[in-house]
Amino acid sequence: GSDLLTPGDNKTAHDSYAFLVNWLERFPQYKYRDFYIAGESYAGHYVPQLSQLVHRNNKGVRKPILNFKGFMVGNAVIDDYHDFVGTFEYWWTHGLISDDTYQKLQLACEFDSAEHESEACNKINNVAEAEEGLIDAYSIYTPTCKKTSLHRRRLIKGRRPWLPRGYDPCTEQYSTKYYNLPEVQKAFRANVTGIPYSWTACSDVLSDHWKDSPRSMLPIYRELIAAGIRIWVFSGDADSVVPLTATRYSIDALYLPTVTNWYPWYDEEEVAGWCQVYKGLTLVTIRGAGHEVPLHRPQQALKLFEHFLQDKPMPRPAHSIQSF
């Protein structure tokens, strides 16, 4: 319907807020409980925007029903300029694109908006994509879906120690198949109007009509940090779509004082990633994880979520020497 023609960041925040308020009316046992918001990728916009709306609506309320405490985002779009700089740097430093393309990307794109790129930026992005080849951009070191028929996976299991156990690059294909089953749509009370086209994981109809997408979330970060809201940002370091370097440049632009300097955090005596605690924000990286961290590193992701909820920095090894 007309909803498809008027989407945007602002509408998404207000729709989500209306959903939360109505959901709490339906399930009142959850009213007044500590409430956190988390998301990844473009939810780097949705999560801070919804957080800001909840925070502002709670102002002056002594006992808010939506008892908002903090948010967490992963491999998140944060600030278009710094994200572009960090993304192109990641592609080049990880050997995905040529020197020439790297320079041209910097010239053509860095002052564009992520949602509305110029023609020149689009063009050179296509060149970059061709240079990268058929890799999984969301997880640059793991096989792509086409190659992992069950037969092949059995063959390579023993020979490739870097292939994460249990990661299946074909999840998107499965969900596309699943959500197009008539009985599934019926159970969801979806597609009651009999839409002639298939459900897709990423809809062009939506992105083509997207109305508003601010270039930066940093002003919201500043507002919520000042209000004492807990903010954690995490990043899987094998993602080239919203890579760690993009996140680091964006966070650096906040100029927050450091509380605990960069250190490795551990899971079962292995380095699981790195962590830096700033005043008002904690940054955690997850080693070897792609764009969707819990999909690639479920055990480490669980540890991350537990520490976020307890507001405890990520674990160091028992014998670690404090060198800073």
Curated annotation (Swiss-Prot):
Glycans are attached at residues 10, 191. Its EC number is 3.4.16.6. InterPro entries: AB_hydrolase_fold (IPR029058), Peptidase_S10 (IPR001563), Ser_caboxypep_his_AS (IPR033124), Ser_caboxypep_ser_AS (IPR018202). Disulfide bonds join 109-121, 145-170. It catalyses: Preferential release of a C-terminal arginine or lysine residue. Keywords: Carboxypeptidase, Disulfide bond, Glycoprotein, Hydrolase, Protease, Zymogen. Signal peptide: none annotated. Carboxypeptidase II is a dimer, where each monomer is composed of two chains linked by a disulfide bond. This is Serine carboxypeptidase II-1.
